[in-house]
Regions:
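Short, surface-exposed loop/helix-turn segments at secondary-structure junctions
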Residues: 20-25, 80-96, 121-131, 152-157
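Double-stranded beta-helix
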Residues: 39, 49-117
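Extracellular/periplasmic catalytic domains that process cell-envelope and extracellular macromolecules
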Residues: 36, 101, 131
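Non-heme Fe(II)/2-oxoglutarate
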Residues: 108-109, 113-207
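Conserved double-stranded beta-helix
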Residues: 1-58
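Short edge-strand/loop segments of extracellular domains
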Residues: 9-11, 59-66, 134-136, 140-146
Length: 207
């Protein structure tokens, strides 16, 4: 399981400078680098995902279009080391995305090849949200045996020291646009259950 950071939006109806930015339609899996199915991506919201607030939007069945996307986006092959790929503004998939409404605790899962984005809504009804407009956890799941011993060590250190990684749980590297937390000195490592320790990479039988 990935060690992603969270998506946090503050209410912006009365403070426009708080309005978050929408992400462009994109894939997190470059078909030139990782052809075929590799993992399951997901989103776990702690607040309702509504049209007024916005949230994850997906292009249905776009996970089956890797060959077509490669032919239309030559830069994917020219830059095969990059996973995050933005869909061309003129691509026919533009405008095909749909919002997935969710309630707190729902778990949205999708094929890692799926084209998707995070879209900010008008924020009309978020004025009643006293704390946050959106809080969602990105979750990616893949086979543990893909992670090397070095990666497992980095994952353990990340939990101990308060670091987040990209969507790819077996690579343990930073994500696009990652920033350092200003309050890192206040971070305290969590007390994990055995199941949680296994998800990070600990061999609980050896403890």
């Amino acid at each position: 399981m990935s060690l992603d950071g969270m998506i946090i939006w503050r209410p912006w109806s009365e403070k426009e400078d708080r309005r978050p930015g929408s992400s462009k339609l994109h894939m997190d899996q470059n078909p030139a680098k990782k052809p075929g199915f590799h993992c399951i991506q997901g989103m776990l919201p702690l607040y309702p995902v509504t049209p007024s607030v916005g949230g994850t939007m997906v292009v249905p069945r776009s996970h089956l279009m890797q060959a077509e996307l490669l032919s239309r986006h030559k830069n994917m092959s020219r830059e095969p080391d990059r996973d995050y790929r933005v869909i061309n503004p003129c691509d026919p998939l533009q405008g095909q995305e749909v919002l997935v409404p969710l309630m707190p605790g729902d778990l949205l899962l999708w094929d890692s090849r799926l084209v998707h984005c995070g879209r900010v809504g008008p924020g009309i009804d978020d004025v009643n949200t006293s704390t946050l407009a959106r809080a969602s956890m990105c979750v990616t799941m893949g086979p543990r045996d893909k992670a090397s011993r070095e990666v497992l060590t980095r994952r353990k250190n990340a939990v101990t020291e308060g670091w987040a990684f990209s969507h790819w749980p077996w690579e343990a590297r930073g994500s696009v646009g990652q920033v350092s937390a200003e309050q890192r000195a206040k971070y305290r490592a969590p007390q994990l259950s055995e199941d949680q320790m296994k998800l990070v990479g600990w061999d609980v039988s050896a403890l």
